[in-house]
Each structure stands twice: as structure tokens, then as C-alpha cells.
Amino acid sequence: MDFLLLGLCLHWLLRRPSGVVLCLLGACFQMLPAAPSGCPGQCRCEGRLLYCEALNLTEAPHNLSGLLGLSLRYNSLSELRAGQFTGLMQLTWLYLDHNHICSVQGDAFQKLRRVKELTLSSNQITELANTTFRPMPNLRSVDLSYNKLQALAPDLFHGLRKLTTLHMRANAIQFVPVRIFQDCRSLKFLDIGYNQLKSLARNSFAGLFKLTELHLEHNDLIKVNFAHFPRLISLHSLCLRRNKVAIVVSSLDWVWNLEKMDLSGNEIEYMEPHVFETVPYLQTLQLDSNRLTYIEPRILNSWKSLTSITLAGNLWDCGRNVCALASWLSNFQGRYDANLQCASPEYAQGEDVLDAVYAFHLCEDGAEPTSGHLLSVAVTNRSDLTPPESSATTLVDGGEGHDGTFEPITVALPGGEHAENAVQIHKVVTGTMALIFSFLIVVLVLYVSWKCFPASLRQLRQCFVTQRRKQKQKQTMHQMAAMSAQEYYVDYKPNHIEGALVIINEYGSCTCHQQPARECEV
């Protein structure tokens, strides 16, 4: 074919000048990449995109050229051999996820220089050589999640200056090598969650100047030091949820632009007072489900930019140390979870923190100050119960006395009696509403029974009528018995004249006197 085209060009050049143009066009056509030779059986072709998915393939199709995209997901590939994709020099994306790949040779992706997206997730890969991604310097996205990687080669991502997204979730990675991401200057999203990381090196994330989102959740980290994230000037979201973190510290004094931090579900008992001063732009903070008992006033003062915070599920000690937190919450204008319960002391267990502060007068005058600060009168129960004229609890710094010692300043704020009256009214209203609600429930049950079971109600009514008749009969019998038991006395008035009664017999007369008598009728 090439010789024929060359002969035609020479012929046209000899006969007319326009042959030069035709020869140039022919040369251009020869330089264009060849179209795919044919669509393999059972695969789906869309132009220069080939989809061979869920076909139980054990090897990649052969004799493929000119493809821009190849999907071999949901098959039974077990290994990637060296030079397996050498004929796909125009390929821009390659999907190999959901196979059984356990071995990837170092030269498996040879000559795939134009590939920008590579997916190897949901396989059984245990290790990757340093040279695995070297033939693909234009990679933008790599997905290695849901494999069995235990370690990362120190130079695994060397040369990937255009990489923007890297997924390594759900592996068995125990350590992140120092400066492993040094060349990943464009990386914006990094996910190493659901692994087995126990610690972080100070320079593990060095070079990630454009990183905006970092996921380290569900690992085994026991300590968080903000010094482990140096120069991450573009980081906006840091997720450390569900680790085993007990303390949070910061050994470097520098400021970064973090806006969202998730530390929930850990075992945090202590946070350095200055730890949040390095994140002055923090807007969302999640500290729920930890072991915090109180929060230092200095930490609370550094939360000036927060708009949302979660603190539930901690072991709050509702003693004097809780006053600073209660005061801050009463003045906080953002969103926070209302389910903050006291874990100690015993008399306040299960009570809401703000309710306990008010009910037990924890922050009134006369108590000793904590941490060089004194909180004045009781913190109001809720913003909806606080009267307009009452003031919230105020945190006041101490001053120096005449002898140079620190003396607390107490400030008495009005509104205690009004708040107490409001609480009493609230209790009365709540009880009344509960009674009304109970009565309505009873009426509703009777109405539903009357509508759904009329025969049963008729029998029940007849039973009540019969019982009432029996009770009336019993009462009548008792009354008649009582009347018959009474004695009625009738005075007897004889017809003859009371006086002497003369009886005459053969011996003579006998005189006797007759006394009046009474007859008793029964």
C-alpha cells in the first residue's frame, strides 16, 4: 500500500503541481493512529473505547491498538505481566478493578505514557514495585483501595507530578514512608483511611502543597501531633475519625488554613491548651465520642471562627471545671449537639451539662476559681429560657493584687430569680401538657374501640347494667332486713279501771292490785 501511494505521488508530481498537495495529504493519513482492528467477541465497543466487563476473562484481549479507553473490570485476571499492554500506546484510561489480581510486575504498564486514570481497586495486590507507575508520568488519578497492601515502596509515586487524586483506602498499610509524596506536587485528595497506621513520621506528607482533603480515619493512631502535617498550606479538611488517639498536641508554631477537622470516635483525654491556635480559620470541629472531662479556657478562646461543633458522648465532669465550657456554649451562635450529659459527680450523672450548671449552682459566686479564671453567676439553662434582661455567664481574667499575686475578679450578674421562675413555669406547663396528652390518649383509645369493636362495647355495657341492677337489689334486701329487725312498741290501754281486783271464792274475798301492762308485738 505504501509503495502504491508513493508511485501515485511521483506520477502526480510529474504531470501537475497539484500532486504535491495530494502527496502531503496521503502522508498525513499515514501518520494517524490506526483504528481498532475489531471488537472482540462479547465485548462492547463505543468508537475507540472497549468494555470487556464481567466476562470471566483470565487474560486481556490481544491484538488491540488505537484504543483510548479499556475496561476489564469484574473479570478473573490474576496477574499483570510485563509488557501486557504495550500495543495500547494511545490509551488514556484503564479500569482493572474487581478482579483477582495478586501480582503486578514492575513493567506491566510499559509504554502507557498517555494514561491519566488507572483503577486497580478491589483486588488482592500485596505489594507494588518502585517502578510500577514510572511509565505513566501523566497519571491524574490512581485507585488502589480495597487491596492487601501492607507496605508502600519509598519511591512508588516518584515522578507523578500531575497526580491529583490518590485512593488507598481499606488496605493493611502500617507505615507511610518519609517523603513518599515528594513529587506529587499537584495532589489534592489523599485517602489512607481504614488501614493499620500506628504512627506518622514528621515528613510523611512533605511536598503536598496543594492537598485540600486528607483522610486518615479508622486507623490505629494513638497520638496526633499537628507537626506531622507541615506546610500543608492548602489543606481544608482533615479526617481522623475512629482511631485510638488519646492526646492532641502541636510541637510547631505555625498557622494553616484548615476549615474542617473530625476527631470523633477516639479516646482523647487531653488536648494542649494552644493546639487550636494553629488553625484560626477552623469552622467545623467534631469531638464527640471521646473521653474529655473538661476543656481549657484557652482552647475555648481559640474557637472564635467555629460555626459547628459536636461534643456529645464525652465524660463531662460537672464540677467547677465545666463552667468555662458552659459559658462558651451559652454564648455560641453556631450549631452544636444538645445532648451533652454529665458523667460525674454522682448526683449529676445523666443530667444535661447546662441544666446541671444552673440546677446545682455550680458557677455562682463564692466558689474557688479554676485555672486562673473565675466564672460568675449561674449559666442559663437554655437560650429560650433566658429572659432578655438576664446576662449569660462571663469569663473574667484575674488581676494583680497589691503584693503582686494573682487575684480573681468576681462579677455578679442579675437574672437568677427570673431564670428560676421561668424554670418553675416551664415545669408546670410541661406537667399540664402531659396530663392533657394522657387524657387525649385515653379518649382516643375509647373512640377507636367504639368504632372498631361495637359488639364488644355493647356486651361490656350490658355487663355494667347487670352489675348495677344486682347492686341495687342487694341494697334493697339490706334495707328490708334492717327494717324488720327494728322493734315497734305499742302502749296498751286497758278498758277497766285500774285499781283493786276483788276475787270471790268459797273461803271469802281476796283483794289484789293490778298494775298496768304492755304488750309487745313481734
Curated annotation (Swiss-Prot):
Localization per Swiss-Prot or TrEMBL: Cell membrane; Postsynaptic cell membrane
CC per GO annotation: endoplasmic reticulum; excitatory synapse; GABA-ergic synapse; growth cone; membrane; postsynaptic specialization membrane
Membrane topology (UniProt): Single-pass type I membrane protein
UniProt cross-references to SUPFAM superfamilies, sorted A to Z: L domain-like
Principal localisation: membrane
Disrupted gene: phenotype observed: Mutant animals survive in the expected Mendelian ratios, are fertile and display no overt phenotype. Brain morphology appears grossly normal, except for rare cases of anomalous ventroculomegaly. Increase in the presynaptic area occupied by SLC17A7/VGLUT1 in some strata of the hippocampal neuropil of the CA1 region.
Signal sequence extent: 1-34
Pfam families: LRR_8 (PF13855)
Transmembrane segments annotated in the record for this chain: 428-448
Organism superkingdom: Eukaryota
Expression across tissues: Expressed predominantly in the nervous system by postmitotic neurons, but also in some non-neuronal tissues. In adult brain expression is most prominent in the forebraain, particularly in the thalamus and in the cortical areas including hippocampus, piriform and posterior cingulate.
Disulfide bonds: none
Keyword Glycoprotein: yes
This protein's UniProt keywords: Cell membrane, Glycoprotein, Leucine-rich repeat, Membrane, Postsynaptic cell membrane, Repeat, Signal, Synapse, Transmembrane, Transmembrane helix
Membrane-side (Cytoplasmic) residue stretches: 449-522
Ranges in the topological domain labelled Extracellular: 35-427
LRR repeat intervals: 64-87, 89-111, 112-135, 136-159, 161-183, 184-207, 209-231, 233-255, 256-278, 280-302
Residue positions the entry lists as glycosylated: 56, 63, 130, 381
Residue ranges of domain LRRNT in the record: 35-63
Described function: Exhibits strong synaptogenic activity, restricted to excitatory presynaptic differentiation, acting at both pre- and postsynaptic level.
Family statement: Belongs to the LRRTM family.
PANTHER family, per database record: KEKKON 5, ISOFORM A (PTHR45842:SF12), SYNAPTIC ADHESION-LIKE MOLECULE SALM (PTHR45842)
Protein name: Leucine-rich repeat transmembrane neuronal protein 1
Annotated source species: Mus musculus (Mouse)
Lineage summary: Eukaryota, Metazoa, Chordata, Craniata, Vertebrata
Gene label: Lrrtm1
